[in-house]
UniProtKB/Swiss-Prot annotation:
Residues 17-44 bind DNA. GO terms for cellular component: nucleus. InterPro entries: OAF3, Zn2-C6_fun-type_DNA-bd_sf, Zn2Cys6_DnaBD. The keyword Transcription regulation applies. This is Transcription activator AFTR-1. It comes from Alternaria alternata.
Amino acid sequence: MMLQCAPKKNERLRGSCDFCTQSKLRCNKNKPSCRRCTLQQQPCVYSVARRTGRPPKHPRKANDCQEANGQHGDQDPVTSTPGGSYQQQSNHLLDVEGDGANFTLADASTTAQGRETAASPALDNALLVGETFGFSSLLDDPLIQSDDFFSFSLCMPPGEKEGHMASPRTLNGSTGPCSPTVLSSIDVPHLPGRFGFLESSVESGLHGRTRPHLVEQPDKTVPSSFSEIEKIYDEGLTFSGLDSAINAVTNNGKGEPNISGTMAAHPHSKRQCFCSTSMSKLQMLVLHPTLCQKNSRARFDMALFLEEVVFSIYRDVLQCLVCQSKSLHSLASLCICTDWVIEALRDVAQDLSSGQDNLGGFRAGLYPPKDKFSICVGRFVLDDQLRESCTRSLVRYRLRKLIPIMDTMMKLNHRGAGGALSQAIRTMVEDVHHKIESALGMMEL
């Protein structure tokens, strides 16, 4: 009579053959025929085990067992042939030992002892059952929750210091290079000595309303003429250092700019806008008394730097999502700064047209040449003709780059109510257009 497994239970074969079981002898469990059946020259059959164990907890596993029973219903498990297939327990693996004819069933826990890294238990169970595994459940696994799982050793050359990648938790809690805490300005007391003219001149205006005026320093701090500020600029002033100094003076040594007005005007906005702070910073520098002295011209490299700052502020304002409703006061401030830059570039164009060498010692290299009026490109020093040609092309490019910006400002000004401020902005934009065309025409002559 054919033995059948109980419903919802795994069907597995006996560990020993029927002949050894009836004889109550130990079977060596060789497949396809054990040693005793080979000596007796009789077929070695393995019956279905009567003790099948507990039913599986997972319903899909039980359904797979029932489907396997239906597929093998026509076959007699008692008379299984040596070449036939047999079903094994799900928690065992089939390992090959010795020659190709000898097979042994080994437990999975014993074979996994030699592994260097242990896999996730949830993933192993899903692979054994054969179900679709959701990798979101791996986040709850203790192995993946450890910080070592996300740390990797970079392949560094010999002698280099080994680095490690930070975990996502560390990256989320860290302060990036673009965060407000890192981008905060430096304090005013830590300014270098060459920025003293900015610190002392503006500090009294910033603190005059809340505290007594500070005693101004003598001429050691505040330069009395444009030649002194030019000398300070020659001592190693770089564009990045100047930007840090402007930040420190504008923010009054605070960690972050004041954005209360921006957030109050846009309460539903989650982004912080620094456009107004940048425009105030630029206007404070342009209107500095040392740069606005009569009968004096700004250095060419200073004018190029301010033109680059103006262009970047224009780009930020036009692309800012918070500043979608452009303020006429912001446009007026940008027009004033742009007019100052155009005046400086027009002075350079006028000097080139008249043949004068009043470029203020424009230099493009880190180590300037001995000649004050030469341009150093790497190790080469340009002569007068090449210097004039390069300067002319550079000024022409900078002037033409501001033309579409002024056209955009004119379009934004048309949104205004048509009051006195809107009319003033229209007049300033037209004046800047006229100055740009005049400078370009002067350079073409």
